[in-house]
Amino acid sequence: ANFPTVSLNTVGITRQIPQDFMNAV
């Protein structure tokens, strides 16, 4: 999934989120 610039700052947190969920977003 492509991460917005803002998510890059919280990539440590987003890594814990399933990729399937990120794809839904």
Swiss-Prot record:
<keyword id="KW-0378">Hydrolase</keyword>
<dbReference type="GO" id="GO:0030598">
    <property type="term" value="F:rRNA N-glycosylase activity"/>
</dbReference>
<protein>
    <recommendedName>
        <fullName>Aralin A chain</fullName>
        <ecNumber>3.2.2.22</ecNumber>
    </recommendedName>
</protein>
<keyword id="KW-0800">Toxin</keyword>
<comment type="similarity">
    <text>Belongs to the ribosome-inactivating protein family. Type 2 RIP subfamily.</text>
</comment>
<keyword id="KW-1015">Disulfide bond</keyword>
<comment type="subunit">
    <text>Disulfide-linked dimer of A and B chains.</text>
</comment>
<keyword id="KW-0053">Apoptosis</keyword>
<comment type="function">
    <text>Toxic type II ribosome-inactivating protein (RIP). Induces apoptosis. Has cytotoxic activity against several human cancer cell lines. Is less cytotoxic to normal human cells.</text>
</comment>
<dbReference type="GO" id="GO:0090729">
    <property type="term" value="F:toxin activity"/>
</dbReference>
<keyword id="KW-0325">Glycoprotein</keyword>
